[in-house]
Amino acid sequence: MKKLVALMLVCMLSFPVVSIADKDSPNEGASEKVEANANDTAKKSDANAKAKDENEKKQEQITTNEDGVFKNVIHQRFQGENRAKTAVNVQRHYFANTNKVILVNDNAYPDAISATNMSMGKYPLLYTGKNSLSVETKSALDKMFLDEIYLMGGVNTISKNVENKLRKNFPHAKITRIMGNNRYDTSAESAKTRSNTTNLIFAAGTNYADALYATSLAAHQNAPILLVSNEGLSQSTRKFIQSIGNIDNVTIVGGEISVNQSVKNQIENLTKKRVTRLAGVDRYESSVEVAKRVNANPAEVITTSGEVFADALVSSTVAQKIKAPILLVKKDVLPLSVREYMKDTNSIYKLTTIGGYNTVTKNNYSTQVILISGLDIDKPLLDKQGKGLIKAFTKDYKKYYVLPNNKYYNSIKEYDKLFVYLRDALAEDYRPLE
């Protein structure tokens, strides 16, 4: 059908165009009366044409509304030359006036997750090396008016040398170190900084993914995230749970491979509550399940890598600040569960992606924008000129083609290249042509 239509369009373009005005013009020897009548007729014709044109515009707008208007999606991306720079760029945008900052070793993802218990969207997370601050982080700190700097982890994570330099360079800032004997103890220590909490969230301490997208749920429920091991709850975790007077809701984020049934039973026995588990078949579907629980009709979503933790972890404090869910994506593939969620959730009009092209490719990013805009990515794309020609061949053109009307699509220049496909059919991967 598509090839036939394209061929017919090319054939039409080879025919000479007949001007209706030339065909209907009066003979040179016509009388003045005929000319006057012709002028009156022309005026009426112009008025009718204008009215018809206005009606067609209104009708087209109504039709477009019925079929689904393409939304003007607000989209932005935060990235940097390295993970430290990405974190700084996020801080400058969302936490420009902060007076507190949390420093995390750039290779210690468990400490970064624990940092969210203290941040809760109020303070930024910046990266440091074990023995020295990066140039990017040092420059960012120099521009802030800080009264407190948190260090996540012990001296084996952020050395005493770094701490001493911070005390020297920022004499008016209080330096507070949050640490434990291991990642689970550090998690429990960070949870102690939360007050009036009646909800608890548990996630695996052996991978960053589940705990990362759980941060938006933690902000929604005003709950700390406690990292756990499948070997059982640590003593510090048990003590923290027992220190809470009244517990309302208890949630495990992640499947049984991440947090097994035995640990779930321990949590239920300690909290005296039935535990809710949020999980999907993989981390991508799990992030969708959590997103649905955070907000059924979100205005904004955050996407970040489900494969590389460095850039992704910076998104946690942003998600808490703007109350937006985090969706995990692959580098150059938009997983089916995430794609369907974006397509079906009509409330979304803003997309924030955190991470560079090495973690989320340009094609993947543009696919997300297109899906959120409301475009049916399974159909070929027509420009406005192509629409007029297609209508001559089929009245049901909207069943087969998409007619974009916003800034994301360039007009098609040649009719023999009328059909531009946005789908690159590789398993679950949809990538628009650049």
List the model feature ranges, each with a label:
Residues 1-22:
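Sec-dependent N-terminal signal peptides of Gram-positive bacterial secreted proteins and lipoproteins
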Residues 22-69, 377:
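Ser/Thr/Gly/Pro-rich low-complexity, disordered linker/stalk segments of secreted
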Residues 52-408, 419-422:
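Extracellular glycan-binding segments that recognize GlcNAc-based cell-wall polysaccharides
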Residues 406-434:
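Compact, charge-rich alpha-helical regulatory domains located at protein termini
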